[in-house]
Each structure stands twice: as C-alpha cells, then as structure tokens.
Amino acid sequence: MFVAMSRFTVGNDMTAEVKEAFRNRPHLVDQAPGFQRLDVISPADNPDEIWLITYWSDENSFTIWHRSHKFREVHKWIPKGLKVVSKSVKLRPFHHVCS
C-alpha cells in the first residue's frame, strides 16, 4: 500500500468553508484506479492546518492520478477566495508498513 499525505494551512478566515467543502467533495478521486480512501484531518492545536491522507494500492496509481486532468479538476471546488499560508503546502509519500 502507498500513502500520500499533503498538508496546507488556511491563511484567511475560511477554515470552516474549506472543511465543509471537503465534507461535500465531489468524490472524483474515488473512481481512480488503485484509490482506497481519503482521510481529511486537522490538528486539535492548529485547526487552520488541513491534512489530506490518501491510501492507494500502489505508488504508480497515485502518480497517474496526481498527473491527471481529473486531479486538476478536483481543485475547482475549493472555496473561492481561499488563501493558503505560503510554504505551508507539503506533499509527502509514504510506504505503508503495517496496521
């Protein structure tokens, strides 16, 4: 299993709108080959920080999705006016060891 974790911090007063957008997301990634699940989490001590954790059957499936047109399309539903703290955006790949 391959896991991709991405993080960003909301830089304006739109944290509630961003979280609501994730709750109502269009689920486009759900049909991607190899996709298993998406978790959206936020640290208790920093609610403006958003972590996206996607689980994939393999790294190649993630890479294909990440380079796809649909990946870019998914970002169209992000609330208009959202400002992200510069240098807060990070994507890290992981290999799942065990559960």
Features from the language model and the residues they span:
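Glycine-rich beta-strand-turn "strand-cap" elements at beta-sheet edges
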Residues: 2, 39-48, 76-99
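Short, well-ordered beta-strand segments in beta-rich or mixed alpha/beta enzyme
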Residues: 3-8, 39-68
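Short, surface-exposed ligand-recognition loops at beta-strand->loop->(often short) alpha-helix junctions
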Residues: 9-18
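Intrinsically disordered, low-complexity segments enriched in polar/charged residues with Gly/Pro
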Residues: 14-15, 26-28, 40-42
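Hydrophobic alpha-helical membrane-association signature
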Residues: 21-22
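An amphipathic, aromatic/His-enriched active-site/gating alpha helix that lines ligand/cofactor pockets
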Residues: 27-33, 55-89
